[in-house]
């Protein structure tokens, strides 16, 4: 108990001597820093906690240096921290160790340097797309062209329509039967072989036709052949080609549109046999013109007559 009292007395005496060794201006700095105990995270009057705060020592030193130019800031600091352990943060940070009769110097310099670099890169690409179609109706040749240029982003549609006239050769075999019938002007019914009719096809000469009439001799009779029509139908194919269209876009963009057209056209060919009249002898009623080679010879004889 007595020992505790003795320690307290010694501590109080030490504080009193420290207070007496500094000027009134320096004492004001010490009081202000003790009043800031709450800001330093310490309770009021907790000197042990204050000694553990480096900012407590910095505050005393800086305040004395600026507010009390006639006082030795290092001496004031060493006196104020003389009750703190030598390894406390307030002492070691400020270099305030040693006896009160000594002088200590401490310097605090801080330099901050910062460098930063920023780089920005941007890349952009332009794409161009184009589609082209060429359609051909009928068959023939035509051209469809489309072009487009763009910068950055290019988008377009090139449409080429290829139309043309079918140019082709219609080939085929005409199959048809040419038959001719003729009526007598005298009222007698008669049928001729269709002499003078021209057509292309099988049985074009009317071979095998049967003639009969009321006027067997048919002398001076005028016969009229009906129109003989043979229709030949063939299909022809042509092609239509559309020119390619191209498109180039600055940035990056390219496209190719190709137009092509194809079609088919139907062509028909017809032949018409002209009307013909013949005067001469016609086979008697009931006579039948022979078929095959004999019929052809008989027909030729009639034409000559």
UniProtKB/Swiss-Prot annotation:
Domain of life according to the entry: Eukaryota
Keywords: Cell membrane, Cell wall, Disulfide bond, Glycoprotein, GPI-anchor, Heme, Iron, Lipoprotein, Membrane, Metal-binding, Phosphoprotein, Secreted, Signal
Disruption phenotype: Increases susceptibility towards the chitin/beta-glucan-microfibril destabilizing compounds Congo red and calcofluor white.
Binding locations of heme: 46
Subcellular localization(s) per the UniProt record: Secreted, Cell wall; Cell membrane
Biased amino acid composition, Gly residues: 95-149
Lipidation, GPI-like-anchor amidated serine type: 276
Xref: InterPro entries: CFEM_domain (IPR051735), Extracellular_membr_CFEM_dom (IPR008427)
GO cellular component: extracellular region; fungal-type cell wall; plasma membrane; side of membrane
Manganese listed as a keyword: no
Annotated signal sequence range: 1-18
Cystine crosslinks: 25-68, 29-63, 42-49, 51-84
Domain notes: The CFEM domain is involved in heme-binding and contains 8 cysteines and is found in proteins from several pathogenic fungi, including both human and plant pathogens. The CFEM domain adopts a novel helical-basket fold that consists of six alpha-helices, and is uniquely stabilized by four disulfide bonds formed by its 8 signature cysteines.
Protein name as annotated: GPI-anchored hemophore cfmA
